[in-house]
């Protein structure tokens, strides 16, 4: 009776570990397949550059010094525009 219980629990543990590992591999493979093409990344880059420079120009028109806008997502503001870090 004890041996049967130990065998069942061991099989259950192996099954759980195998299922978890399989799910992780599947998730990793989906992440590798689903990526933004370079053209989409370029469009995002251009959009952020435009937004930052326009924001800076609007601030200049108010007769105030242009304050550096905090750019997000790996960008920094330099020379009144967003630059990829």
From Swiss-Prot:
It holds the Pfam family Toxin_20. Keywords: Disulfide bond, Neurotoxin, Postsynaptic neurotoxin, Secreted, Signal, Toxin. Belongs to the neurotoxin 12 (Hwtx-2) family. 02 (Hwtx-2) subfamily. Residues 1-22 form the signal peptide. Disulfide bonds join 52-66, 56-77, 71-82. One of its GO terms (molecular function) is toxin activity. This is U4-theraphotoxin-Hhn1z. Postsynaptic neurotoxin. GO terms for cellular component: extracellular region; host cell postsynaptic membrane. It comes from Cyriopagopus hainanus. Residues 23-48 form a propeptide. It is found in: Secreted. InterPro entries: Hwtx-2-like. The keyword RNA-binding does not apply. Expressed by the venom gland.
